[in-house]
Amino acid sequence: MKKLTMESLLVYTFVMGVCFTSNLTCEQKIVLIQEQKLGAICISTCYVNGVLAGNSSCVSVRTSYLINLAMLTDGFKAMKVGNITSISEKTAFLRVIINYYFRGVMLRALIAKRLPNAAQLSSTVNCWLEGHSAGGVMTLFYGTERIVLKSSTEMNASQWTSDGPDANGTLNILNERVSLDSYFLSMICPQLSDEIYKKKVVHSKYFSLIKNDTMPKKFLRNTWKSAWTNWYKYKEIEALLDFSRDYENVSEITHSMSAAGLFFLAGGAFTMLLLLCCLSMITRKHVVKDLGYK
């Protein structure tokens, strides 16, 4: 019998581990910026079994990759929730919910609809598959308030709950069609985390759920809220919207700021040189006078 090398033993251990434990955590954070021309920035960070798998602008999340992996799950293939039964409807649902909870679209919609004065809002999606246990948790953080949805294969039904007063009526929106959130958390996301973990084991060196873009490359433009003021939950399943339209590439702004900076730097250098010349002339005049020269 051929002996196992240390490398093959490690691979075997990893593959066996895939069958028992996988954990996916992604956090999105929107921070409003007061500076002119920059409305806000959305940052997404993902971890696979505790190991960083991407950190950049929310618009850089590999949504197509996540959707394709989610389509491999049994939860997607067997999905029959509400009036979502056909492949096209289920694919539209995946596209929307992954944009909602992995690219910060839900945060943008809630800020525009219910939390216009929020300076910062964040959300976390965590789902796992461990043996026969599978489930997930979605958490929204607004100030000191935390809004949570928990769902698993052992739970029959679940609702969004808040540990605060929910003065803005956010729960009313979140609990619309909550069965779709719950199904994704319990039946699709855990298996998605397993598919992601398998890919990470095979391609550990180059694996990432988020494109390696510079964080400040994409900002939310000042007008991004206007598109979401009439929003209601999962409207995008029926209407195919471009989720990236809220973003603005600020390379031109950066270049103009750099040009302005160079202009002021050059102007400052010229002024300093002029002052030094004047000082040199005055000093030379005094030296000549002290030496008795006319």
From Swiss-Prot:
<keyword id="KW-0812">Transmembrane</keyword>
<keyword id="KW-1133">Transmembrane helix</keyword>
<feature type="signal peptide">
    <location>
        <begin position="1"/>
        <end position="21"/>
    </location>
</feature>
<feature type="transmembrane region" description="Helical">
    <location>
        <begin position="262"/>
        <end position="282"/>
    </location>
</feature>
<protein>
    <recommendedName>
        <fullName>Putative immediate early glycoprotein</fullName>
    </recommendedName>
</protein>
<dbReference type="Pfam" id="PF07413">
    <property type="entry name" value="Herpes_UL37_2"/>
</dbReference>
<dbReference type="GO" id="GO:0016020">
    <property type="term" value="C:membrane"/>
</dbReference>
<keyword id="KW-1043">Host membrane</keyword>
<keyword id="KW-0732">Signal</keyword>
<comment type="similarity">
    <text>Belongs to the herpesviridae immediate early glycoprotein family.</text>
</comment>
<dbReference type="GO" id="GO:0033644">
    <property type="term" value="C:host cell membrane"/>
</dbReference>
<dbReference type="InterPro" id="IPR010880">
    <property type="entry name" value="Herpes_UL37_HHV-5-rel"/>
</dbReference>
<keyword id="KW-0472">Membrane</keyword>
